[in-house]
């Protein structure tokens, strides 16, 4: 019995214990952590009783017990507080650098940033700084790209400041508007050459060909002036997003409206006027295309009837000419008879006078 117990004890693996070297490293790292936190503004949080939720991974059948256990909170130990505040110092320094960059490089956002920081709670400081920093970075990048590639746009914006034509859009909105127009132009491409549609009709042994070059060229001219329905909607939605409208991704309805001043300014802008003119030309072009399509369909469906209609028209014209000729001859005959009667009456009167004399 004693031998079996001794063999079992020998076969058991020894417990893994950390080496002294690792313990020394952990001690010095903890010492650095506590010293940095003590000499930072985070020392205040070391003496606050902060709670932390306990993560419960046990699977119990009773749901009420699970919810109660998941909602339980415990106080952090002093060591956990030191570690938590030490790692929070890194994020604090990053956000502090973002704040300095926002206030110096993106100085036009300084007023909004400070006002938001004063009004908001301290728990929202990092989110506010990140939003202002990312927004300022986008604005600065858009301005730089426009300055390098499309400097006349920037000159126009500064030139119209303080006037009725002032563009109140942000630099990112102007950037999206300018470069999205170029993308749309590249997608549209150049105009297509006019095509001639010849249709042969076989009726009564004769054939006729009709060319639709003029109709196709006129419809292409209208298409060149106007944009398609989808392009017009895309341009209008893009302009609304640029001035501050927000749309729901699922339903497509408007979820946020801009201020009334911005909407009034947009209604007075040249872009809104161009869109309205484009919608008018779009309707005219679509109506012209529908008419041309209907004419082509009628010609294709009623080919043999065209010749019959032409023949009937010619017969009617010939009959009208015959009737007019008959009427003209009757009028001429009446004139001749009237002239002969008048001349005979004059002769009879002269004969009577001569007899009297």
From Swiss-Prot:
Q: Coiled coil: which residue ranges?
A: 305-337
**What is one GO cellular-component annotation here?**
endoplasmic reticulum
Query: Has keyword Coiled coil?
Result: yes
The transmembrane segments are: 21-41, 86-106, 135-155
- Comp. bias (Low complexity): 195-223
Membrane association type: Multi-pass membrane protein
Query: Basic and acidic residues bias: where?
Result: 305-314, 322-337
Which portions of the sequence form the region Disordered? Answer: 184-229, 283-357
UniProt keyword annotation of Transmembrane present: yes
Subcellular location(s) of the protein: Membrane
Q: Where is the composition biased (Basic residues)?
A: 346-357
What are the entry keywords? Coiled coil, Membrane, Transmembrane, Transmembrane helix
Under which name does UniProt file this protein?
Putative uncharacterized transmembrane protein DDB_G0291600
Organism per entry: Dictyostelium discoideum (Social amoeba)
- Mind giving the lineage of the organism this protein is from? Eukaryota, Amoebozoa, Evosea, Eumycetozoa, Dictyostelia
């Amino acid at each position: 019995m004693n031998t079996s117990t001794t063999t079992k004890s020998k076969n058991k693996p020894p417990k893994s214990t950390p080496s002294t070297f690792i313990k020394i490293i952990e001690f010095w790292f903890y010492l650095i952590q506590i010293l940095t936190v003590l000499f930072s503004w985070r020392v205040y949080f070391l003496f606050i009783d902060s709670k932390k939720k306990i993560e419960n991974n046990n699977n119990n059948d009773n749901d009420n017990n699970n919810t109660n256990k998941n909602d339980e909170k415990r106080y952090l130990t002093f060591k956990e507080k030191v570690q938590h505040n030490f790692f929070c110092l890194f994020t604090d320094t990053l956000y502090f650098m973002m704040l300095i960059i926002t206030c110096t490089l993106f100085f036009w956002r300084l007023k909004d940033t400070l006002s938001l920081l004063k009004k908001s709670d301290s728990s929202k400081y990092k989110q506010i700084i990140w939003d202002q920093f990312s927004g300022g970075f986008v604005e600065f990048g858009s301005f730089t790209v426009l300055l390098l590639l499309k400097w006349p746009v920037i000159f126009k914006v500064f030139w119209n400041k303080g006037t009725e034509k002032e563009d109140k859009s942000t630099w990112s909105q102007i950037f999206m508007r300018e470069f999205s127009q170029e993308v749309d132009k590249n997608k549209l491409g150049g105009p297509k050459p006019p095509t001639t549609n010849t249709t042969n009709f076989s009726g009564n042994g004769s054939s006729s060909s009709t060319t639709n070059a003029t109709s196709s060229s006129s419809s292409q001219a209208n298409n060149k002036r106007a944009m398609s329905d989808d392009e017009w909607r895309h341009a209008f939605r893009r302009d609304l997003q640029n001035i501050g409208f927000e749309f729901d991704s699922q339903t497509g309805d408007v979820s946020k409206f801009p201020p009334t001043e911005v909407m009034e300014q947009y209604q007075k802008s040249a872009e809104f006027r161009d869109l309205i003119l484009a919608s008018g030309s779009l309707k005219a072009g679509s109506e012209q295309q529908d008419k041309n399509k209907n004419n082509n369909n009628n010609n294709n469906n009623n080919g043999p009837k065209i010749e019959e209609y032409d023949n009937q028209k010619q017969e009617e014209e010939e009959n009208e000419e015959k009737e007019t000729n008959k009427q003209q001859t009757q009028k001429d005959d009446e004139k001749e008879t009237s002239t002969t009667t008048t001349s005979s009456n004059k002769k009879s009167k002269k004969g009577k006078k001569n007899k009297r004399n």
